């Protein structure tokens, strides 16, 4: 498990986990897609996720969808190498700025939809954060540094804390 956001207590930690996830998996040009899918061809899709707005703790997860000649072992090795690279070097300034800009823009543009606004308000209220703290989250995202990203990856996203699973389709004879 990884920590979720508790306003005023762990703003930077939760926001840094969210930004790290965005750098790794936020769209086609994200690190996992660029490195594992496009460059190394260890999977035909790769992604990661984290929800900072949960009760208690949450899970940080990553996954890949493999083709016939792609192995789980090769994917997992490439996944950890990509995460290790971000953890060791940190994001470059452009990566960090782009990730934060996308996340903040997504939050702002989500306000154009009554459905999404209601969903966000309800979610924040249900988990005990309170909808009035939404702008605090945007400020927390904006304050994340490259060192913050490295710190949370070193603390939370490490092989010793991971569990690997393999889902395979049922083979019918």
Where does each model-flagged region fall?
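In a subset of proteins, long, contiguous C-terminal domains/tails are tracked
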Residues: 145-173
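Generic solvent-exposed, charged/amphipathic alpha-helical segments
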Residues: 20-21, 33, 80, 150, ...
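Short coil/turn residues that cap or connect secondary-structure elements
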Residues: 24, 28, 70, 87, ...
């Amino acid at each position: 498990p990884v920590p979720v956001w508790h306003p005023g207590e762990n703003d930077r930690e939760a926001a840094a986990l969210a930004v790290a996830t965005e750098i790794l998996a936020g769209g086609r040009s994200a690190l996992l897609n660029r490195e594992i899918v496009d460059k190394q061809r260890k999977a035909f899709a790769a992604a990661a996720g984290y929800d900072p707005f949960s009760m208690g703790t949450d899970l940080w997860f990553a996954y890949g969808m493999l083709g016939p000649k792609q192995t789980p072992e090769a994917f997992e090795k490439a996944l950890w190498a990509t995460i290790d690279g971000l953890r060791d070097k940190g994001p470059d300034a452009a990566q960090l700025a782009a990730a934060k800009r996308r996340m903040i823009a997504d939050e702002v543009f989500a306000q154009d939809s009554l459905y999404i606004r209601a969903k966000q308000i309800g979610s924040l209220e249900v988990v005990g954060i309170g909808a009035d703290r939404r702008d605090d989250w945007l400020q927390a995202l904006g304050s994340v540094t490259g060192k913050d990203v490295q710190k949370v990856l070193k603390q939370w996203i490490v092989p010793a804390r991971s569990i690997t699973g393999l889902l395979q389709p049922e083979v019918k004879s």
